Amino acid sequence: MLKYKRILLKLSGEALAGNKEFGFSNEVLESFAKQIKDVHEKGVEIAIVIGGGNIFRGISGMEKGFDRVTGDTMGMLATIMNGLALQNTIENLGVPTRVMTALQMPQVAELYIRRKAIRHLEKGRVVIFAGGTSNPYFTTDSSGALRAVEIQADVLAKGTKVDGIYDKDPMKFDDAVRYDTVTFDEAISKNLGVMDTAALSLCRENEMPIVVFNALEEGNILKMAQGNNIGTTIKKK
C-alpha cells in the first residue's frame, strides 16, 4: 500500500561518488536507478533533485579562490552532469526520464517550466530537476524544497547516508538516539543540520512534510513511499 502518490526525492551528489572522493560510482547509480524503477512501477510519480557535491561544491570553491557566485554557478552545472548520468542509468532500465534545468541549456536538457514538469509526471515519466534554482546562495536542499512545493508533491524525501535524524552524530557517539518525528520548529531551533534554514522554512510555511532516510540501502525508497518507519519525519506538529 502506497502512502505517497507524488514524491520529490532529494539525493546528495556526494552519495553518487560511493567510496570515491570524486566522480561517479556505477554501483550507486545503478542502485538508485533500480530503486527508482521499482517505485515508478508501483504507480508513484517521482521527481528528483540531485546535488553536485561529488563534482564541485560552490561553498568550498571559495577556499580555492573563487567568488561565491562563480562557485555556486559551477556547482549548479555539476548538478546537470549528475542529472544526465542518472537519466541515462534510469533509461537503460526502460523508464522514460526527462532532465529539466533551471539554467538555459537547450541542447542538453529541457528548460524547467512548472506546468510542463507536472505534465511529464502525469504521463508517467521520471523528472530530474537540475541546475538548482539558477540563483547563487541557494543550496540544492532549497531547490528540492522549492520544486516539491511547486509540483505539489505529497512529500519531500531526503535520501542520505544515514537512517534519519539523531540527537548527535551517530558516527561518533554509540548512544546517539534517532528521532522518529520532529517538528520544523525543533529542526530549526536545535540546528539539527538536516537541511538549511531556508529549505526548512519553505517546507514549514507550505506544510510540506520531509522524510529523511538512508537511500543507499536497497529497497528503502520504495519502503519510504509505502510509509514504512525507516527514517525521521519532519512535520508541522
Annotate each predicted stretch with a short phrase.
Residues 1-237:
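C-terminal catalytic "cap/lid" subdomain
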